[in-house]
A protein has these predicted regions:
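Beta->alpha loop/short-helix hinge microenvironment recognizer with preference
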Residues: 1-175
Length: 175
């Protein structure tokens, strides 16, 4: 089986992400990948190296700015001896754990970029140039529950190809 996992950041970060699209879209990919890899390798969840595909979306269903990562996760992986390890037919990572680990990894990368003075602040993000305001924003984001959507959606390679084609080869408003 294949699983569909969506990693979303709180809307409070949208203005900073919009001002730093390359850096913070990369951070989305890094945090999502690191979360999946770390948790899948943990023996209490799967104890294997998994395969997945990540797709960045920058808009939501209401045509609003809504950066998030869709992932297609293979239902199993290779253990340390390169033997296939099944997930047992259900998604193998707890949703709450995925959300908390992803939140930590994304905000850690955001803090590192801030500390290295790599972030730019335009428009409504200008207020976060102030270190106090930036820390307030981070605190607010750490306090929020980040929701990660997970479900089994795909049966077979053709379903995955159809899904990817639908979302990777269109714009926000299409026929």
């Amino acid at each position: 089986p294949y699983y569909h996992v969506v990693f979303t950041v709180p809307e409070e970060l949208n203005s900073i992400i919009y001002s730093n699209q390359k850096l913070l879209y990369d951070a989305l990919y890094h945090a999502a990948s690191a979360t999946l890899n770390e948790l899948a390798k943990d023996a209490k969840y799967l104890g294997a190296n998994i395969g997945y595909i990540c797709i960045l979306h920058t808009w939501g269903s209401a045509m609003n700015y809504h950066p998030h990562i869709h992932t297609i996760v293979l239902g199993g992986g290779l253990d340390d001896e390169n033997k296939w390890k099944e997930t047992g037919g259900k998604f193998f990572l707890p949703y709450g754990v995925i959300s908390k680990v992803f939140r930590g990894k994304y905000l850690d990368e955001l803090k590192s970029l801030w500390n290295d003075s790599k972030l730019k602040f335009h428009g409504t993000a200008e207020k976060y140039q102030n270190s106090y305001r930036f820390k307030e924003l981070l605190d607010k984001c750490y306090e929020k529950n980040w929701v990660t959507y997970c479900k089994e959606t795909f049966n077979g390679a053709q379903s995955v190809i159809n899904y990817l084609g639908k979302y990777t080869h269109r714009i926000a408003i299409s026929n």
